[in-house]
Amino acid sequence: MSMIITILNGPNLNFLGKREPEIYGTETLKDIEQFCKECATRLGVRIHFYQSNYEGQLVEWIQEAIGVSAGLIINPAAYSHTSVAILDALKMFTGTKVEVHLSHIYHREAFRHHSYTSAAVDAVIAGCGGDGYWLALEYIVKRFNRNK
């Protein structure tokens, strides 16, 4: 059985391609999901890809990944700046965790410079657009293989 990596996307990411394309680009979340599936196939892993606008749903998916997924990629979107609940759920997940942001959050408004959720992850990738997901997938697979 191949390794599973869970990919979670937070609020408003379902509007990628339409919402502020000058910041987030024109790729849709479906484009990113397809790209992740192609990358996963090349890397020999499986992905579970989800999006929700609801904090509690993201927490539940993190909990469901415990003991199932070797790694977790999360783009918590605006919840990165507010959610202690997601932070606490991420702390419970013992696999490799990567936080991804499409935009460079440190080049944006000051309130976006602090991420609560990043305190519980192994790496943060910001400002690479959809390629950040590929970088996160590759990092998780390399780290898993190195620690076998």
From Swiss-Prot:
The active site is at residues 24, 101. Keywords: Amino-acid biosynthesis, Aromatic amino acid biosynthesis, Lyase. Substrate binds at residues 75, 81, 88, 102-103, 112. Its EC number is 4.2.1.10. GO terms for biological process: amino acid biosynthetic process; aromatic amino acid family biosynthetic process; chorismate biosynthetic process; quinate catabolic process. The record marks 19 as: Transition state stabilizer. Pfam families: DHquinase_II. It catalyses: 3-dehydroquinate = 3-dehydroshikimate + H2O. It is an enzyme of class 4 (lyase). One of its GO terms (molecular function) is 3-dehydroquinate dehydratase activity. CDD domains: DHQase_II. Pathway: Metabolic intermediate biosynthesis; chorismate biosynthesis; chorismate from D-erythrose 4-phosphate and phosphoenolpyruvate: step 3/7. SUPFAM superfamilies: Type II 3-dehydroquinate dehydratase. Catalyzes a trans-dehydration via an enolate intermediate. Homododecamer. Belongs to the type-II 3-dehydroquinase family. This is 3-dehydroquinate dehydratase. The gene is aroQ.
